Amino acid sequence: MRTRSQKQAKLIGRIITYTILIAAAIVCLFPFIWMISTSFKETSDIYKMPPSLLPANPTLENFIEGWKGADFGMFFQNSAVVTFLATIGTVFSSSVVAYGFARFKSRLSPVLFMILLGTMMLPSQVTLIPQYLLYYKLGMVDTFWPLIIPSWLGGGAFNIFLFIQFFRSLPKELDEAAKIDGANSWQVFTKILLPAVKPVMLAVLVMALVYNWNDFFNPLIYLNSSEKFTIAVGLQFFKGSQGNVQIGQMMAMALVSLTPVLFVFATCQKYFIQGIKMSGLKG
């Protein structure tokens, strides 16, 4: 009798849990579903009252006009270039810095590591003005360099921390055995340790790709010429001078801009979760 009541209690608990999770998922996904629906609607259908979730006459006009009207292909290309270079820089530089922290010890290592972690609590807006003045004096404003260079100079404290945690979990005997065979520190890093941290590399790659692709603030600050805008900034072209917004075209191009990120995350989701999990458990 007691066993049956326990099973019933567990069943009820699971039903309640799944109900809450499903409801939360619907709430989170509804704006995305509405965006997809709006991108296929005609203008008259978008402003119809009461609003409907399904388009009355599905059309691809918003995609065609949005892509041609705002020269969205140029924005897409700019985002692809910046995201590719910045993502590669993030993965490379953060892994190199983490290798130094994990394998080369000195008296200053703990202090430097605490300073590194402290930068995670520093808002990016604090260093915005000094960085802007630096790039301005170097003649790099209105170029892609301010969006790319920081990724090659450390790659972010959180990414470095993930790599450090995983590097520390690898036995140093691997390094010593490779050095006995004649490998130098760079060869140990590239041929021995990096292949062993692929899950973390993919996790950092996905996070960096999503961040750089969706970044709106930095391109808005550093880019002035419309032909150099990225997708995030280019979406503002669908706002008219009188405040009127071409909602259908904006939703269509927002959906197009999300497609690469969703594809990468769906493809690498397994490795992304594995990398985060292993970095948290090891070290």
Where are these regions (language model features)?
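A structural signal for multi-pass alpha-helical bundles of membrane permease subunits
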Residues: 4-283
